């Protein structure tokens, strides 16, 4: 009888999880399809938004197409990339809805903090990159190609597809860099790695920065050097912030232990929660 009860509970939990996965997958697919068609419908406006840093240069600036299918490929690529950025919050929310019901109250608070931190870093880095980094990069590249004499005339007329891909790569590098401090803080908070492990193994972090820069950046040595430097700098800043947070938490924990609040809290710990989702 006990075996039948355990088998029934297992089948019920498995059916519940599979049903929840099906619901979340349907929502993601619907959002993905609607977002892609919407981005393709407004693909010209999206391309203009990405091309705005180049179009604001002081001289006559315009793009060229050298192939018959280049314009269509640019529209499709821009729509797909913009769709991936716009649908990312929906995918994150559906994953959050799937995982959060099985957590305790303290775990929910902790995971919500990581979720908000990840989203804030993502949009902050994206905004700073598009509003400050990309215009300065194109301003530098434009005036590097300018000539100071009349004996040699060089006029920059970039291909629209190459320009969009390079701009998207810069934005993607910033998106990857934005999640580095979140990952470091998450590992330290969940005790997956200690702060001493990070500080004593900085050479491995440098290898990680080189590997990430080589994997996610275009095959250009200067782009990889800049990406490696940015990732290393962000990791060091995250370790510094985590060190400050750890010192504050140790002081708070010692104060709570002296007052006896931690022992009282451990005695009144809540019972385990069952997996049940009411999020839609």
From Swiss-Prot:
It holds the Pfam family TatC. The chain crosses the membrane at residues 46-66, 81-101, 114-134, 137-157, 170-190, 225-245. Keywords: Membrane, Mitochondrion, Transmembrane, Transmembrane helix. Its main location: mitochondrion. It comes from the Eukaryota. One of its GO terms (cellular component) is TAT protein transport complex. GO terms for biological process: intracellular protein transmembrane transport; protein transport by the Tat complex. It is found in: Mitochondrion membrane. It is a multi-pass membrane protein. Residues 258-280 are annotated as: Disordered. GO terms for molecular function: proton motive force dependent protein transmembrane transporter activity. InterPro entries: TatC. The keyword Membrane applies. Disulfide bonds: none annotated. Signal peptide: none annotated. Belongs to the TatC family. A stretch of 270 kb of the mitochondrial genome is duplicated within the centromere of chromosome 2 resulting in the duplication of the gene. The expression of the duplicated gene (At2g07716) is not demonstrated. It is also probably not RNA edited and therefore differs in all the positions known to be edited. This is Uncharacterized tatC-like protein ymf16.
